Structure formats: structure tokens, C-alpha cells
From Swiss-Prot:
ATP 1 binds at residues 66-71, 218. The keyword RNA-binding does not apply. ATP 2 binds at residues 449-452, 550-554, 592. This is Bifunctional 3'-phosphoadenosine 5'-phosphosulfate synthase pps-1. The gene is pps-1. Residues 242-653 are annotated as: Sulfate adenylyltransferase. Pfam families: APS_kinase, ATP-sulfurylase, PUA_2. Disruption phenotype: Lethal phenotype. Embryos hatch, initiate growth and development, but arrest at the L2 or L3 larval stages. Abnormal cuticle. RNAi-mediated knockdown causes a 42% decrease in 3'-phosphoadenosine 5'-phosphosulfate (PAPS) synthesis activity. Reduced sulfation of disaccharides of heparan sulfate (HS) proteoglycans. Defects in cell shape of epidermis and patterning of body wall muscle cells. Some phenotypes only observed when grown at 25 degrees Celsius; such as shortened malformed tail, exacerbated molting defects, blistering, and sterility. It comes from the Eukaryota. GO terms for cellular component: nucleus. GO terms for molecular function: adenylylsulfate kinase activity; ATP binding; sulfate adenylyltransferase (ATP) activity. Residues 1-26 are annotated as: Disordered. Adenosine 5'-phosphosulfate binds at residues 93-96, 105, 110-113, 136-137, 175, 190-191.
């Protein structure tokens, strides 16, 4: 006979973001699972002191086992932390591992368990933190005592009834524990909701129906209540949290690598690995891995992520209720799909599996769990994503040549993705960039994406942008962010571009004091206005507020024609009204050309057109190949030497 499940522990079957650790307590319940928090100590520290005013309180979540208390409270904890509000989640199972490890399951011990938790929660709240307590706490008397402990010290106590029905909770009963099943079979005695009563709150401040509403909706209801009570700051900066998919615990990494030896594998292409890097570092927050069909359809048809539910349910069908617990406060722009194509043969080998090792060049980089395989429908995809299915478009060809199926699922990344090409020092994650900007005391960050060498016209635009930002900010910082993933064969290679950018900074054409050079890991798609939304949206993860959009961004020549495939002004126009990007200040690209009178790059002046010369990329490449130099003031001399050397080497090799 198993010991009784502690009535104050949480056994939610809603998805967790980290692998749980299992109890090794001797003489205590074996039904206690340690719940890992979803935010790090560093993230907690970043929230301290960001807002004035006291907002300490305890939010007490009560409900049946499996109702969703821990899932909601931890999602709320992450959201509050993102908003700069210090908070901490107390979970019933976690408390049983420490503070209350000496307590059993008699009525007296259960009362003492709640009393201790209430006293600890009061201290957290009294320190100015928002304490989130997730406990079944089935008895009204115990919850009233917890309230009195707070209110006797004039500390706010907010009771939240997670009112998920017993039927739904039993449906969620997670394997391998299957606590409800065991309780029904008489293997667990005193289990709340089965043979022990649950007394619903009579006057809870908030009631959540987590059987009907998603995690994000529940979190929003709690936030709305906090706002109505003046417990949220009036001005909240819109700086979304970053969702990294790296496994941070070395022991867990070792366990996953050992497990991978017995798992089916999928061999990644280099482009697949680049997309895995994008996901792992958090550029595609809130995605937890390669898209499932639901998110794929949202991206392809709406250009947005509307939710993080796992399955698509037809009208009238019952959903499986699986939903990622990452908080989504609003729809998120996601104009391009992030997917993992697989072949027919690979699909056959994955039938019925629940976990898959993702490898590149024989090395395990990630474990994909809860997989979903769905049809790629490549022709439909390229027509929607690129506006053409012409295989002469290099990225269209790449899609058409890929697998007929897409593999979606959550990924746990077991190692940092590096390419050992001498450029890894420039591959900064969003969180690393945020730390750099904080160290530089940036009060504004503006980004400039490019896949070409920098001439002085580009630099003029960046300097001019900073001058304008200085009217409202003290220290705006430039994120010079060249695209570092796959590009078409005739583009300048990444290593040459980085050397050229280094030379521009070394000559102080761009001031190193306010310029941060970093590589953006995304592959290029040449999808025009569709892709430029991704380029802007992904940089929000790094903490930018301003984005410079160029002429014909992510554009390409129409196959078989000298014309551009996409209308050259549409990228900027689309960004100005794209859904989910309203918090991002879009800075239009001012046209710069070579001013023959001033002998420098200047903004084009229509009143003296004859004084300006447009030095095209074709002309620039011709000058470099022939060993000629461009006009004075077109490009920093050492930067030109890098570029000329590259084109000269191409000519020699040919």
C-alpha cells in the first residue's frame, strides 16, 4: 500500500518546462515530485529594484491535484519576473523536500504543513516580493488560518481557486505516477477528491477554470486582478523574456547523452543546425522546438503565433488539452515557419517513438520529445512563403529538394552550437547581448541587419540614426547584426564580411564605444517583406527597441529577369503595420549615394541629382576584381582592402 498523497502537493499534468527531479526521501511519500522553476537566479536578480513602490503579497492557488496550480503559478512567476517584479513560487512538492520533510500525513501534520508555508509566504510578501503558493490545501479552515497569518500583519492575501473539475484532473493523470488511477484502485488512501474531501473556497478573490481556459488566459486573469488592486507598476517596459532551450544542468546533459545512445536519430543538415541554434538561443521565443502542425499553420496562414497548444482539433472534436505553459500575453509575429523536414524513409523509422536524438556530423545536439510528423506540402509552402515556386530561386529550391514530411516537437539542446570557424566569439545569444547592453548602460538599442559589406552610406545612416535617438536618449547603442546562416553562393562569405566590418569599426567609421558587432544565426530565405518581419521580430529577443529597415530588405532578383522579385519599398511598408511589432520603432532606410562634389557618401538630394552617383554592387565587385579603388570617401580604405582581396582571390581561383 502506498503512503497517502500529500493533500498539499501538486501533481499537475499540464506541461512542465524542465525535467523534474524525483524524491529520494526515505520514510516519506513516494508520490512527491520536485518541480523545477522555469527562471534562473540571474533572471530573478535582473528583476530586483526595477520599479518603485511596495507590492508584496501572497497569491494562494488551491485546487485538486492536476488542476493546473503549479503550471499556472510558475507561468505567472515567469511573467512577473519578465515585467521586473520580484516574485517566488512555493510548490507543495518542493516544500516537502525541505521545510516540511519531517511531517507526515496525519491531519495535525497537514495543518502544520500549511501553517509553516503560510508563515514563510508572509515573510516573502513582507519583504516586498509577490509570493506564489501552489497547494491543494483542501480544507477551508486551513486556508482561513493562512489568510489570518497574513492579514494580522497587514499583508495582502489573494486566494485563487483553480476550479478544474475532477473529471478533467483524472483525464490529465500523468504517467507513470497515475495517482488518480491508484487512488481509485485503493492503492493510495486519503487522496483528495477520491476518498478525502476537497472544500472549495467560498470567497476566493479569483476563480480560474483551467479545464476550459489555457495557461495564458489564466495568467492574464491574475494579472488583471493585480492591476486592479494597484499591485502592478503603471509603466511596464515591454521587454519579453527569452526562452532558451539549452539544458543547463551538467548531470541532466549526461543523462540525455546516455539516453541518446538508445534513441532513433535524425541527421540534421547544416541549415537545420542553424535553425536549431536560432531556437536554442531564444531568437524564436516562445517556440519550444521545431513547429508542430498547429504553429506551422498559424505561421503560414496568419503570419503569427496565436497559442502554444499542441494539436489542431476540428470543430466538434475534443482537444487533447496539451499546451505549452510559456506565457503568451498576446499574439506574436511569426511570418516564417521554423520546421525540420524529413524524408519518407526517416519517417518510417520514427513511427511510434516518443523521443528522438538530433545529430549533426555524428554529434548529438538535442533530444526532441513528444514528436509530431505531418505533411510538408512543399509547393503550397513556397508559394505562400516566397510568392513563387520557381526552383531558380535558391531558397525555393532548398525547400523543394527537402523531405516530404515535417517533424515537430520540443527540443532539449545539450550543447552550445558552435562552428569552430574563428567567428564563434561573435555569436552572442539574446541574453548575452542584453548583458552587454546593460554593461554599456544603454538606454536604447537600435539594430541594423545586413548580409553585404558596409560602405560609408550604410555607416552614415547608422550615425544619423544615433544622432536622432540622442534627442530622447543618453546612450543609444547600435547592434550591428550581420546574418550568419546560409546565404546564396554569390553572396560575400560570412568570414569576409566580418573582417570587413571589423575594419569599418577599427577605422572608427562606426564608433566602437557605441557599436556591438554580433552574428545573427538565422539562415537567409530571400523572402522579401515576409522575411523582413522575422528579421525585426527576432531582434526583440536581444532587447532592441528600434530597427532600421533597408530598401528591398531580404530581396532578390526575379529569376530570369533584371527586375527585383519584390517591390523594393514593400518591406518597409509592411513592417510599419505588421501585427505583433507595434512596440518596435521602425526606422526607414534613407537613400545614400556618392556625392561627387563633396567626395563622400551623402543622403540623396533631389535638388542636385547630377552631383550624385549610385555605385551599385555590380560596379563595386568589378572595381575590386580589377584591382581598382572606389572613389574617395566611398568605403573605409582597410575595409575595401578586405573586400578587394576576396574578389581578387576569386578571380585568381577561376
Amino acid at each position: 500500500m502506498l503512503t497517502p498523497r500529500d493533500e498539499n502537493n501538486e501533481g499537475d499534468a499540464m506541461p512542465m518546462l524542465k525535467k523534474p527531479r524525483y524524491s529520494s526521501l526515505s520514510g516519506q511519500s513516494t508520490n512527491i515530485t520536485y518541480q523545477e522553476h522555469t527562471i534562473s537566479r540571474e533572471e530573478r536578480a535582473a528583476a530586483v529594484g526595477r520599479h518603485e513602490g511596495f507590492r508584496g503579497c501572497t497569491i494562494w492557488f488551491t485546487g485538486l491535484s492536476g488542476a493546473g496550480k503549479t503550471t499556472i503559478s510558475f507561468a505567472l512567476e515567469r511573467t512577473l519576473n519578465k515585467l521586473g517584479i520580484p516574485c517566488y513560487g512555493l510548490d507543495g512538492d518542493n516544500i516537502r523536500h525541505g521545510l516540511c520533510k519531517n511531517l507526515g500525513f496525519s491531519k495535525e501534520d497537514r495543518q502544520e504543513n500549511i501553517r509553516r508555508v503560510a508563515e514563510v509566504a508572509k515573510l516573502f510578501a513582507d519583504s516586498g516580493m509577490i509570493c506564489l503558493a501552489a497547494f491543494i490545501s483542501p480544507f477551508q479552515e486551513d486556508r482561513l488560518d493562512a489568510r489570518k497569518i497574513h492579514e494580522s500583519e497587514n499583508v495582502k492575501f489573494i486566494e485563487v481557486h483553480v476550479s478544474t473539475t475532477l473529471e478533467v484532473c483524472e483525464q490529465r493523470d500523468p504517467k507513470p505516477s497515475e495517482l488518480y488511477k491508484k487512488a481509485r484502485a485503493g492503492q493510495i488512501l486519503g487522496f483528495t477528491g477520491i476518498d478525502s474531501a476537497y472544500e472549495p473556497p467560498e470567497n476566493a478573490e479569483i476563480i480560474l477554470d483551467a479545464g476550459k481556459d489555457g495557461v495564458q488566459q489564466c495568467v492574464q486573469k491574475v494579472l488583471d486582478h493585480l492591476e486592479s488592486k494597484g499591485l502592478l507598476p503603471e509603466q511596464i517596459p515591454d521587454v519579453p523574456a527569452v526562452r532558451e532551450l539549452f539544458v543547463s544542468d551538467d548531470l541532466t546533459v549526461a543523462e540525455l547523452l546516455k539516453e541518446s545512445q538508445n534513441l532513433p536519430t535524425v541527421e540534421l543538415t547544416k541549415v537545420d543546425l542553424q535553425w536549431l541554434q536560432v531556437l536554442a538561443e531564444g531568437w524564436a521565443t516562445p517556440l519550444s522546438g521545431f513547429m508542430r502542425e498547429r504553429q506551422y499553420l498559424q505561421s503560414m496562414h496568419f503570419g503569427q503565433l496565436l497559442d502554444l497548444k499542441h494539436k489542431v482539433a476540428f470543430v466538434g472534436e475534443k482537444s487533447d488539452d496539451k499546451e505549452d505553459s510559456w506565457p503568451m500575453m498576446d499574439d506574436i509575429n511569426q511570418s516564417i515557419p521554423i520546421v525540420l523536414p524529413i524524408s519518407d524513409d526517416v519517417k518510417k523509422g520514427l513511427e511510434g517513438v516518443t523521443r528522438i536524438a538530433l545529430k549533426y556530423n555524428g554529434q548529438v545536439y538535442a533530444i526532441l520529445s513528444d514528436p509530431e510528423i505531418f505533411e510538408h506540402r512543399k509547393d503550397e509552402r513556397v508559394c505562400r512563403q516566397f510568392g513563387t515556386n520557381d526552383p531558380r530561386h535558391p531558397a525555393v529550391a532548398q525547400v523543394l529538394e527537402s523531405g516530404n514530411w515535417l517533424l515537430g516537437g520540443d527540443v532539449a539542446v545539450v550543447q552550445k552550437i558552435q562552428f569552430n570557424d574563428g567567428l564563434d566569439k561573435y555569436r552572442k545569444t539574446p541574453n548575452e547581448l542584453r548583458a552587454i547592453f546593460a554593461e554599456k548602460n544603454a538606454d536604447a538599442v537600435f539594430a541594423f541587419q545586413l548580409r553585404n559589406p558596409i560602405h560609408n552610406g550604410h555607416a552614415l545612416l547608422m550615425r544619423d540614426t544615433r544622432e536622432k535617438l540622442l534627442a530622447e536618449h543618453k546612450n543609444p547603442i547600435l547592434l550591428l547584426h550581420p546574418l550568419g546562416g546560409w546565404t546564396k553562393d554569390d553572396d560575400v562569405p560570412l568570414d569576409i564580411r566580418i573582417k570587413q566590418h571589423e575594419a569599418v569599426i577599427a577605422e572608427r567609421v562606426l564608433d566602437p564605444e557605441w557599436t556591438v558587432l554580433s552574428i545573427f544565426p538565422s539562415p537567409m530565405m530571400y523572402a522579401g517583406p515576409t522575411e523582413v518581419q522575422w528579421h525585426a521580430r527576432s531582434r526583440i529577443a536581444a532587447g532592441i527597441q528600434h530597427y532600421i529597415v533597408g530598401r528591398d530588405p531580404a530581396g532578390i532578383q526575379k529569376p530570369g529577369s533584371p527586375d527585383a522579385l519584390y517591390e523594393t519599398t514593400h518591406g518597409a511598408k509592411v513592417l510599419s503595420m505588421a501585427p505583433g511589432l507595434s512596440a518596435l520603432h521602425i526606422l526607414p532606410f534613407r537613400v545614400a549615394a556618392y556625392d561627387k562634389t563633396a567626395k563622400k557618401m551623402s543622403f540623396f538630394d533631389t535638388s542636385r541629382k547630377e552631383d550624385f552617383e549610385n555605385i551599385s554592387g555590380t560596379k563595386m565587385r568589378g572595381l575590386a576584381r580589377n584591382g581598382d579603388t572606389p572613389p574617395e570617401g566611398f568605403m573605409a580604405p582597410t575595409a575595401w582592402e578586405v573586400l578587394a582581396g576576396y574578389y581578387k582571390s576569386l578571380q585568381n581561383s577561376n
